[in-house]
Amino acid sequence: PQIEYLSDGPAVYEFDGYKTFSLPGAYSVDKWYRLNRGWTWFEDEQLSEEEMNTGRKIKAKEQEFDLVISHTCPISYEPQDLFLPYISQETVDKRMEQYLGEIEEGLSYKRWAFGHFHADRLYPRKDGRQMLMLFNRSVVDLQRFMHMTEYDGLQDILA
């Protein structure tokens, strides 16, 4: 398969002819769990204010995208049913989700994909746009995802 590593910050790419806005970063709710076991944790896992401003500038300049890829999702799409019950949401830094909500507002896009919550789910919208949450066990066919209709489900777009 063709694998392309994205830059560590907001950027614009073209994948298979689709103008794509990449917005990495998320807060790790399991940070202390990971650190206590000697597992990897990245201190710069969330975008800095400077990187967020870069994303805002890209949005202002480009305004229209076929696809948006982010690690987490805009705040209005947070799957509350997937929140870990033993972690108080009051302790979770929501800056990235709030930032992505700000970016989504007024942004013209057809599809948005993210993976932070480790589940597979489609969020169909009345305006024809789709929000897709994926975990690393699923591979989506980009062409099928970009051309799906209101009658297609997750199984219809898997590679």
Task: Name each model-derived stretch.
Residues 1-4, 61-65, 102-111:
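A structural motif corresponding to the C-terminal end of an alpha-helix
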Residues 3-7, 133-134:
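A conserved beta-strand/loop element that lines the FAD pocket in flavoprotein oxidoreductases
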Residues 8, 25, 137:
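Active-site donor-binding loop signature of nucleotide-sugar glycosyltransferases
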Residues 10, 55-59, 96-104:
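Short amphipathic alpha-helical segments and helix-helix/interface helices
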Residues 11-16, 91, 101-106, 117-159:
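Binuclear metal-dependent phosphoesterase catalytic core
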Residues 15-94:
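Active-site-proximal loop/helix segment associated with metal-binding centers of metalloenzymes
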Residues 71, 113-120:
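Histidine-centered divalent metal-coordination motifs
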